[in-house]
A protein has these predicted regions:
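Buried hydrophobic positions in well-ordered alpha/beta secondary-structure cores of metabolic enzymes
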Residues: 12-15, 66, 121, 162, ...
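N-terminal beta-loop-helix "entrance" segment that forms/cooperates
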Residues: 32-56, 217
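Short acidic loop-to-helix transition motifs that present clustered carboxylates
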Residues: 45, 208-215
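Short glycine-rich or small-residue beta-strand-to-loop segments that form or flank ligand, phosphate
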Residues: 5-14, 68-72, 172-179, 295-299, ...
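N-terminal glycine-rich phosphate/adenylate-binding segment common to multiple enzyme folds
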Residues: 47-145, 232, 236
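Glycine-rich phosphate/nucleotide-binding loop
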Residues: 46, 217-323
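Internal helix-turn-beta structural module
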Residues: 303-358
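Glycine-rich phosphate/diphosphate-binding loop of Rossmann-like nucleotide-binding domains
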Residues: 7-24, 28-30, 138-209, 223
Length: 359
């Protein structure tokens, strides 16, 4: 079997520094997994110099390799500039789903006692984003229009992934669109969720309108949840869910593309935070989300060795925090590299023990 190749999409400011920390953890010498890396410079300077051609090259590599990890990048404010690479990357790799999971971080107090993980499966295309918009009329007679669309194919992709993922993690599928008001438009998504529920009768399914989903989140603290959502709903809902756990540091963002059988074929992971320019060069930023992005990526390598490495990273990262080794944003005193060093030490130790027990 050939060695997995990961496309590394470099970024800006502290975002790049944290990617470097994640790559230290993904070192084959640490995780005992042979990997190849292909690097692409998506810094603002290089995107401008190449007129975004490097983004196209990076997307082609992610598609070819099936695996990619991306640092946070600067989005310039001038609309005539190169813009954000994120939407372009999602389009070029045919990303259909964005998965974000809120989870408890040791020593960080969540809101309202929320305990079990909550994953938001967000539609990555269609809906309100990318819709054509225009206005007609003048004064108080001016009217704005939007041409949103939902295709059954994309709705089925999101629904299928939602139930497969919920089955894998032992969670309940919870929530849904506002189909009672938008019977035709949002109703197509509800139809596909119901159909997926019928295909996976072993997965608990509690359909709710999106507004009820928000309201009931704080009352469902004991069950792990997977919440399917339309593009714009998922954008706002995932931000809320991550903050419910007290910090976005414990979450990674996973962009997924599927084949015609709804199996995952392309994965691009990243941290949900920005470039944090005020922290650049200070060695104080929290690398946890970026490290978890690397761990999440390994889950899709589909080998036992990769699964063990992924688990070791997740456990090592959280156990270090539980033992008081954490950066200042979580109430600790560890520097960025010190925390990463501790994660590496624990990952190596876990893999040593697990290998010994397998012998």
């Amino acid at each position: 079997m050939s060695r997995p190749t990961i496309a590394i999409l470099k970024g800006d400011q502290t975002g790049q520094e944290l990617l470097d920390e994640a790559l230290r953890v993904l070192d084959p010498a640490v995780i005992r997994l042979d990997l190849d890396f292909q690097f692409f410079d998506l810094s603002l300077e290089n995107r401008r110099a190449t007129k975004n051609e490097v983004v196209h090259e990076a997307a082609a590599a992610v598609t070819r390799c099936g695996l990619g990890i991306k640092a946070a990048t600067i989005t310039p404010g001038n609309p005539d500039d190169v813009g954000s690479p994120n939407a372009l990357l999602r389009e070029l790799i045919n990303g259909q789903v964005i998965l974000r999971t809120g989870r408890r971080i040791p020593s960080v107090r969540p809101l309202a006692g929320v305990y079990a993980p909550i994953s938001v499966v967000r539609m990555a295309v269609e809906d309100a984003y990318g819709a054509k918009e225009w206005r007609e009329g003048e004064g108080l007679d001016e009217i704005s229009y939007s041409t949103r669309k939902l295709s059954r194919r994309v709705c089925r992709q999101v629904a299928e992934f939602t139930f497969r993922y919920a089955r894998r993690v032992g969670a309940k599928v919870f929530g849904g669109p506002k189909y009672t008001v938008s019977v035709v438009y949002e109703g197509i998504f509800k139809e596909e969720l119901d159909a997926a529920a019928a295909r996976y009768p072993d997965v608990a399914y509690d359909p709710q309108l999106i507004d009820a989903t928000y309201a009931l989140l704080l009352e469902t603290t004991g069950d792990p949840l997977v919440i399917p959502a339309l593009n714009r709903d998922g954008d706002s809902l995932s931000d809320l869910v991550l903050k419910m756990f007290g910090s976005i540091a414990g979450a990674e963002s996973v962009i997924l593309s599927m084949d015609e059988n709804f199996d995952v074929k392309t994965v691009l992971t990243e941290a949900p935070h920005g470039t944090a320019p005020s922290l650049q060069g200070k060695n104080v930023a929290n690398p946890l989300a970026m490290i978890l992005a690397g761990a999440a990526l390994l889950r899709y390598v589909k080998t036992d060795a990769a699964a063990r490495a992924s688990r070791a990273i997740y456990e090592g990262a959280m156990e270090a925090i539980n033992d008081g080794i954490k950066t200042s944003d979580l109430g600790g005193q560890a520097h960025t590299d010190e925390y990463t060093n501790e994660v590496i030490r624990r990952v190596k130790g876990k893999l040593d023990v697990w290998d010994a027990l397998r012998g």
